[in-house]
Amino acid sequence: MILSIESSCDDSSIAITRLEDRAILFHKKISQDSAHSPHGGVVPELASRLHAVALPKILEECAPFFPRLKAIAVTNEPGLSVTLLEGVMMAKALALALHLPLIAVNHLKGHLYSLFLEQESRFPLDVLLVSGGHTMVLHARSFGEIEIIGQSMDDSFGESFDKVAKMLSLGYPGGPIVESYAKEGDASRFPLPLPLAGKKEVAFSFSGLKNAVRLVIQSLQNPPNEQEKRDICASFQATAIAHLIQKCRLYLATSNAPYLAIVGGASANLALREEMERLGEHFGKKLLLAPLAYCSDNAAMIGRAALESYALGAFTSPLELTVRPRTPSLC
């Protein structure tokens, strides 16, 4: 069994994964949404303090598994440095105390392997990764061969939802709230510019779109009413998704990978899933989706990725493991 820890942002999570059949024997996550909601976004220092309280509580429930553990795994990159440290320090202490090997896991690779929590691994694979911190197109040939094709030059897809929700005083996290409002809105009422429309490169930008939403709100004579909020959300979501699809289309036209996937917390957006399904059909690629329960940050996906490292004997010394807020690659 592998005990895995996730604390890269504002979710405290620990999981136990069985080596033989990849079964998840234990998984628990404590969200911090209510604590960060008044601030309209994650406050790193607050998140770190909450991890320091939540992780030990979850770990107590894992004690019965300790005698059968074969390794400890932890997210060490990328993420908020102060929150990553909470998980890494716990993992180091466990590895040393229990005399177990330590596995460092890239958080983004964890999201990729959330696809394979309930199905077999399938490669080669083109992936759209969308979360609160990242927006990327990846090409994965295997566990150790993952190429970053393109990424956002500024805000991420998920982050832009949070910021639009804050502009409209809708609350936090913004993703599910904006999606809910968009379902009842008219996307044609407030036309918004498609980012990087004339650029023939696989890259993303959401800062201009975010500013366009701000200008729409400022153009109204009064603060937006509920229907105007719905219409703004509908227009924003439709434009943001169209931007993703346009850039993915550019790359997929050049790729021979038989599989297409979408991962990350924002991949739970049903409108985006539907558009990706259509995109996959257009290019003759089978769309792979992570279970909705494992789209957001969680330790189960970290454990699943750690199984691959364990099989390769890719361990890290507890005395040498450090956190890396940014990651140059996924290999």
Swiss-Prot record:
Q: Where does Fe cation bind?
A: 107, 111, 297
How and how many cofactors are bound, per the record note?
Binds 1 Fe(2+) ion per subunit.
Query: What are the entry keywords?
Result: Acyltransferase, Cytoplasm, Iron, Metal-binding, Transferase, tRNA processing
* GO CC term (a single one): cytoplasm
Matching HAMAP family: TsaD
Question: Which cofactors are reported in the record for this sequence?
Answer: Fe(2+)
State the protein's name. Answer: tRNA N6-adenosine threonylcarbamoyltransferase
Stored Gene3D superfamilies: 3.30.420.40
Q: What is its EC number?
A: 2.3.1.234
Where does the chain bind substrate? Answer: 129-133, 162, 175, 269
Location in the cell reads: Cytoplasm
InterPro entries in alphabetical order: ATPase_NBD, Gcp-like_dom, KAE1/TsaD, Peptidase_M22_CS, TsaD
PANTHER family in alphabetical order: TRNA N6-ADENOSINE THREONYLCARBAMOYLTRANSFERASE, TRNA N6-ADENOSINE THREONYLCARBAMOYLTRANSFERASE, MITOCHONDRIAL
**Which reactions are catalysed by this chain?**
L-threonylcarbamoyladenylate + adenosine(37) in tRNA = N(6)-L-threonylcarbamoyladenosine(37) in tRNA + AMP + H(+)
Function, as annotated, reads: Required for the formation of a threonylcarbamoyl group on adenosine at position 37 (t(6)A37) in tRNAs that read codons beginning with adenine. Is involved in the transfer of the threonylcarbamoyl moiety of threonylcarbamoyl-AMP (TC-AMP) to the N6 group of A37, together with TsaE and TsaB. TsaD likely plays a direct catalytic role in this reaction.
Q: Which coarse location class applies to the principal site listed for this UniProt protein?
A: cytoplasm
One biological process term from GO is: tRNA threonylcarbamoyladenosine modification
The entry assigns this protein to a family as follows: Belongs to the KAE1 / TsaD family.
User: Could you give a GO molecular-function term held by this entry?
Assistant: iron ion binding
